[in-house]
Each structure stands twice: as structure tokens, then as C-alpha cells.
């Protein structure tokens, strides 16, 4: 972000087409915090927008839809620049599948998972596959559908139920513009004048 600002970029576009509110809030807040942190250290730059944004959650790009990252050809040319496993979002890496136990799975760091989470993994056909967590208990995951997953398979969370619940709150992202109110008395009664922080 600092390099882009110093290169003269004045507007940052977020890829939000067909995305939901949680995705937009998460991505906007992530960039807003990065930009604000830079502006605090560099008084020669100022933001174009008015007001101050506050967020009640810690934004993390891999907790909402994310296809991963590439530096394209910035550092060197690569033979393959695409993600060929799937156009879907794998999500946040949780850990490896330790073993299948009856109708459940034991997963590394399984205690991080919650009821309603969506999990993604790459199956033996090298395709993205997934399950939902019906119940998470003491690191053991009971899925909505029991699928054959090889021990050692990397497990990702691409639907974070607890995070979504926090971000969906109406007060999770708020922008306020400071205003000065002046109440004066005139021959016709009283007049209230409001002036925002930019003098309008």
C-alpha cells in the first residue's frame, strides 16, 4: 500500500462484484487500516474522504472469499501464473487431517473450528471439495456429509461462521463525520448551523 500511494495512486478499487456484505466489509476495513496507518506516519499525504472509520473486528483477507495471491511478473516471469486446483476460495489454513474416527474427523487445530464452518480440501482427484461442520467438539469435527479424506490432507476453512456473525453486526463498521453545531438567535427566532470537518 505505501508503495502504491507514493507512486501516485489516489483510489483503490476492491473487487466486490457478486460478493456479499461480509466480504466487502472485511476487505474495505483491511485497506482502510493500512491507508490510515500510512497517513499517520506521513503528514504530507491526506485522505480524500471525510470522517473516521471504526471497526469492531480484526480484518483478515483469508477469512472471506480469496483465491490466493500472485506477484504476476513483478519479480520474475513464471511458467504458470494461475491457480489450477480450483477457481474457488480455499480459505484459511487450519491444519492437516489426523484421522477419520467413525462419522467424524480429527484435525490439527480442530479446536479453532466452530459449528457451521465450511471446510475445503483438495481431494485425490486434485479437485477442491468441501464439507460443513455440523458439530465441533474438543477438536473433533462432525461433518454434514462424511467424505473419504486421506490422512495428512491439508484442511482449510472457507466459511468462518463466528467471524461472519461478528462482521454482520450493524455496528461492526461505522464511519462518523465530526460536525460543529452553532445555535444563534436572530430577529426571526433561532438558527442552527452545522459545519462538517471539511468546512462545508
Predicted regions and their residues:
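Surface-exposed amphipathic alpha-helical tracts and adjacent flexible/coil segments at the periphery
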Residues: 1-200
